[in-house]
């Protein structure tokens, strides 16, 4: 589908690039000739991913940085270290946090836990890279991973929907503001793409697994991670420089059909939601144990 050396000489940073869709995109960039930097909160996971990918693609470099992108000073320090080695040519804002909950049960801390990653962290990353590209007169590309909720909203994931919508507006705003500097900003809005980390918090009861998404999707299935990786490679390529300020859905037309991702949960009882909270708390505890 792509030239084997499409990204030869390029260096991209993928936030949340150690697992799931972030890893899939990073691997695709490396496959096509790029060197990559991945960051996240679990240093051990990042290092293991980097080793595996570099073993698979000899001669390519995957650098890791353990960082909490919610902390602006930590982001600035990381970007400074990355730049000291070699400037970046692109950024993929993939890091996110989310879980399902009745909005009435959300505490301010729970809301901030999502908004600080998805909205604040994405801005910190984008601005830290953008100001350096502008100062150096370097062309670059930013790609943010959103969701179709930015157009429709979604029940039970209000902090994420609000934050992702903010990133969509940031994408469109900076696409105009930074275009004269040769910096493009685009975004992908995926439908259901099952990954282990996200699905444990968004489908904790695992009732029917992803069947409920299949029956409500015109294509009759969920997304394949390779499809998202191919879309990311396309948008990061210099071959499509005229695409700027776009938010592109990749959801099998599920959004057009009018099926909100979590609308079926309207029938859940308070007991169902209690079990969901307990399962998510268990998943979060296991995740925290893996952080460096």
Residue locations for each model-derived region?
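Active-site helix of classical SDR
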Residues: 126, 163, 171
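Active-site loop-to-helix junction immediately N-terminal to the catalytic Tyr of the SDR YXXXK motif
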Residues: 106, 153-161, 173, 198-201
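Short, small/polar-rich loop/turn modules that mediate ligand/substrate recognition or access, typified
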Residues: 92, 179, 184, 243-245
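C-terminal substrate-recognition "lid" of short-chain dehydrogenase/reductases
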Residues: 221-250, 255
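Alpha-helical segment proximal to the catalytic Tyr-Lys
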Residues: 131, 176-180, 241
